[in-house]
Amino acid sequence: MAQLETRTEPMVVNFGPHHPSMHGVLRLVVTLDGENVIDCEPVIGYLHRGMEKIAENRTNVMYVPYVSRMDYAAGMFYEAIVVNAPERLANIPVPKRASYIRVLMLELNRIANHLLWLGPFLADVGAQTPFFYIFREREMIYDLWEAATGQRLINNNFFRIGGVACDLPYGWLEKCIDFCDWFGPKIDEYEKLITNNPIFRKRIEGLGTIERDQAINWSLSGPMLRASGVSWDLRKVDSYECYDDFDWQIASEKEGDCYARYRVRVEEMRQSLSIIRQACKMIPGGPTENLEAQRMATEDKKSEIFGIDYQYVAKKVAPTFKIPNGELYTRLESGKGEIGVFIQGNNEVTPWRFKIRAADLNNLQILPHILKGAKIADIMAILGSIDVIMGSVDR
């Protein structure tokens, strides 16, 4: 009796670049054997805009508004790194108050980044309701940004060499503390709804597992690295800005799967809330209205209340600021991982070389490796757990 041949030829399927779960214009060329993924080739570059070459033809003041369009979920981080590089190359001091304001903006952006990851990730695995919850919380962060910078999501244009563009408006710190008081219980609601949900856990536990050594060898960073058991956070390692002044813990897990990456990001939101609370209480000079009242009540212009640490910018940099000769790599911890800038100056107003390291580009490189052997239905869950923004990947 003749037996039927059950072996089939591999099928090549294109996911994207316009698939709703692609998180941007990413194309995956996936080779399937039935339901099993046997190969995957990411195709990137659809959103390339030449951001590095633009940087090499603009002064720093002109370039800051551009960078929030790269990672439009985390524009503040790119603003920070773009001004940090020439600051360190030129040894420009940053007032303590300005550093605290920067930390407040960065941690608010970290929460906003993780919220915008959480909603679409849960939608990818079939839970639609939390997608609407996260925008309720993000609106409050947008309101805080709008009050401080004039813009909501991108084009904040708030960071400057030597500090920030302006001081915080009256009542801003109180509104920020109100947000912390309101958002803390919301994280508990998320955990109650999601974390121990048996359907959610069965859907993503064990998916996309990355071992500790793999995470290090693939140069992963951020939650992708910390979910694999590596407690590495540049806020602790490099101690940039004023993070040493605060008491907080690095969020990490050991399992290395999609569920561990979810747990890390939720815990990071809690830690960011803690940092924001501490920064609001410890900021030099306190609220802007109190600082101005103290200055008006003090006749001695040599008082410490007029000192550099109580200013929002060390000295406003001229549009003709020249980047000194030399080269430097500087980095910081964004919501997605390590973003960095290699800058090479030649004593001109524009840099000779401006190289940007995007965290999600490095994190995306491991995708073909962890997709092999997975089911076709798990592709979107694994991709969603990485957290990529294609504007940042392609630049």
Swiss-Prot record:
Highest rank taxon of the organism: Bacteria
Protein's membrane topology: Peripheral membrane protein
One term of GO molecular function: oxidoreductase activity, acting on NAD(P)H, quinone or similar compound as acceptor
Protein localization: Cellular thylakoid membrane
E.C. number: 7.1.1.-
One GO CC term on file: plasma membrane-derived thylakoid membrane
GO BP terms in the entry: photosynthesis, light reaction
SUPFAM superfamilies named in the record: HydB/Nqo4-like
A Pfam family assignment: Complex1_49kDa
InterPro entries for this protein: NADH_Q_OxRdtase_suD (IPR001135), NADH_UbQ_OxRdtase_49kDa_CS (IPR014029), NDH1_su_D/H (IPR022885), NiFe-Hase_large (IPR029014)
Keyword Ribosomal protein: no
Reaction(s) the record says it catalyses: a plastoquinone + NADH + (n+1) H(+)(in) = a plastoquinol + NAD(+) + n H(+)(out); a plastoquinone + NADPH + (n+1) H(+)(in) = a plastoquinol + NADP(+) + n H(+)(out)
Key words of the record: Membrane, NAD, NADP, Plastoquinone, Quinone, Thylakoid, Translocase, Transport
Functional note: NDH-1 shuttles electrons from an unknown electron donor, via FMN and iron-sulfur (Fe-S) centers, to quinones in the respiratory and/or the photosynthetic chain. The immediate electron acceptor for the enzyme in this species is believed to be plastoquinone. Couples the redox reaction to proton translocation, and thus conserves the redox energy in a proton gradient. Cyanobacterial NDH-1 also plays a role in inorganic carbon-concentration.
Family: Belongs to the complex I 49 kDa subunit family.
PANTHER family: NADH DEHYDROGENASE [UBIQUINONE] IRON-SULFUR PROTEIN 2, MITOCHONDRIAL, NADH-UBIQUINONE OXIDOREDUCTASE 49 KDA SUBUNIT
Subunit field text: NDH-1 can be composed of about 15 different subunits; different subcomplexes with different compositions have been identified which probably have different functions.
Protein name: NAD(P)H-quinone oxidoreductase subunit H
Organism: Prochlorococcus marinus (strain MIT 9312)
